[in-house]
Amino acid sequence: MENAFKSHLQFTEKAIKKIKNLIEIEKNHDLKLRIYINGGGCSGFQYQFIFDTSINEDDIIITQSEVSLIIDPISLQYLYGGQIDYLENLEGSKFIVSNPNAKNTCGCGSSFSI
């Protein structure tokens, strides 16, 4: 299923630029960013990001500005209405999620609770 959920999870321009840059470095234009939720972290759930070429039967593909995100339906429920950004500062660089469904987040921003 592609783009039916586009308005439910968005990329910022910085995230789009970084994803395109990483795909260029890998020289594999079939790569898509997969985001999924795992149990763990100090708040109960963790965001996980990987580049992937495999698409499972129930995966949802969201494309924005020629960048595709793969997400499973269960993870999308936790991220509904969210935004993926990319942050670079003195502490390092990472993809971050602005999640309106999270009741609490940890200090590092990589885990949350609902």
Swiss-Prot record:
Molecular function terms, GO-annotated: 2 iron, 2 sulfur cluster binding; 4 iron, 4 sulfur cluster binding; iron ion binding
Entry-linked InterPro entries: FeS_biogenesis, FeS_cluster_insertion, FeS_cluster_insertion_CS, FeS_cluster_insertion_RrpA, HesB-like_dom_sf
Pfam families to which the protein is assigned, alphabetical: Fe-S_biosyn
Residues annotated as binding iron-sulfur cluster: 42, 106, 108
Gene3D superfamilies per record: HesB-like domain (2.60.300.12)
Iron-sulfur listed as a keyword: yes
Keywords assigned: Iron, Iron-sulfur, Metal-binding
One Gene Ontology CC term in the entry: cytosol
GO biological process, one term: iron-sulfur cluster assembly
Superkingdom per UniProt: Bacteria
SUPFAM superfamilies per the UniProt record, alphabetical: HesB-like domain
Subunit structure: Homodimer.
Protein family membership: Belongs to the HesB/IscA family.
PANTHER family, sorted: IRON-SULFUR CLUSTER ASSEMBLY 2 HOMOLOG, MITOCHONDRIAL
Protein name as annotated: Iron-sulfur cluster insertion protein ErpA
Lineage of source species: Bacteria, Pseudomonadati, Pseudomonadota, Gammaproteobacteria, Enterobacterales
Gene name tied to this protein: erpA
